[in-house]
A protein has these predicted regions:
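Acidic, Ser/Pro/Thr-rich low-complexity regulatory regions
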Residues: 1-164
Length: 164
């Protein structure tokens, strides 16, 4: 079972990179509030009421929930979700944009992951612009790189399905 902190971290990163929308965040926090058997924090209530606020404001509220306690799990979940999306639609360039934005985030679990994402993003750009390389090969390489993170996405998706 994922903690609220892990879920908030996942939604923060997903919102930051464009994988999740504000509506996704609100849906999640409303579900947490509905199912909670203990008192609800003011931060969760404020987040629930943030539908008309900017992405930056919603992100700030998610960070308040995190209380500066970061783990690698949220990033691993987002990488796994990107894997699943890329496998389902390899022609969809959105995943590469998500990954590029994540590479700008300071909470990547390791330099290896950061360097791999940057390298594959650069290769993807060169291939799609017809400068160098084959787009299908780069997408295949990205799928191979992201595959180990699938298990994290599966846990997140099971948690999401169980909460509905």
């Amino acid at each position: 079972m994922l903690s609220i902190m892990d879920m908030a971290g996942t939604y923060y990163l997903g919102l930051f990179c464009g994988y999740f929308s504000i509506k996704d965040v609100i849906r999640w926090v409303d579900d947490v509030i509905d199912k909670s058997e203990s008192p609800i924090s003011n931060d969760l209530i404020e987040l629930s009421l943030s539908e008309r606020q900017s992405t930056a404001d919603v992100g700030s509220k998610l960070l308040r929930i995190l209380q500066n306690e970061y783990t690698d799990r949220p990033m691993n979940i987002i990488l796994g979700l990107c894997y699943k999306k890329l496998v389902l639609a390899p022609e969809n360039d959105d995943v590469m944009l998500y990954l590029y934005r994540l590479s700008k985030q300071s909470s990547l679990p390791s330099d290896y992951i950061n360097n791999s994402i940057i390298s594959l993003s650069d290769e993807f750009y060169l291939a799609t612009e017809g400068i160098y390389g084959d787009r299908k090969v780069v997408v295949s390489d990205m799928i191979g790189f992201l595959e180990p993170f699938e298990v994290y996405a599966n846990g997140f998706l099971e948690e999401e399905a169980g909460s509905k």
